[in-house]
Amino acid sequence: KYFIGQPREEKASTALAMATQYFDQEIFDKALNGDGSTTTGFARIASDYSGTDAANLANLYAGLCYANLNKWDKAVEYLEKYSPADDALVSPAAVEALGNAYVHVNQLDKAVSYLKKAAKKADAEGHNGVNNSLSPVFMLQAAEIVESQGKADEALEMYKDIKEKYVASQLVQSQEIDKYIERAQDK
């Protein structure tokens, strides 16, 4: 396995690094599809090197490219293929990206579910089980979707949970969360 898998992973990682340069420059079409000469795009890396860590990341990047190109169905397709790891930043953000993509394809319940999942994933890697930077933002997005669905009582509970759980977050410290609580109470 080592003799076959290792070179394949290395080739995939090299291709991924080159495509990432286009992504970092926000040249999303070339990052996604390659440049026709030296760079293989994320979509091809994901299919050609399926089963590798690089292909997994290529699915994430391809989904993000499609999101930036406002091709939301394709964004969902690739983001769903990404398998999150147990890390504090990339995986929660990837799950959040999928949640936001679901908003754009009008699957709001799925969006809320994935945003909550992203917050939980970030909290799992946070200090004392709390991530005061990512999780409150993800939960706020979820609560706003719930509120937009006319479920003010449920949204109010979510806003209050944010205020209680993420006391050290900017959202709570700045008292911005209170505006959301008041708005939901007024409905």
Q: In which residue ranges do the predicted regions lie?
A:
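Short solvent-exposed coil/turn linkers within tandem alpha-helical repeat scaffolds
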Residues: Q6, S47-A55, L69, P84-S91, ...
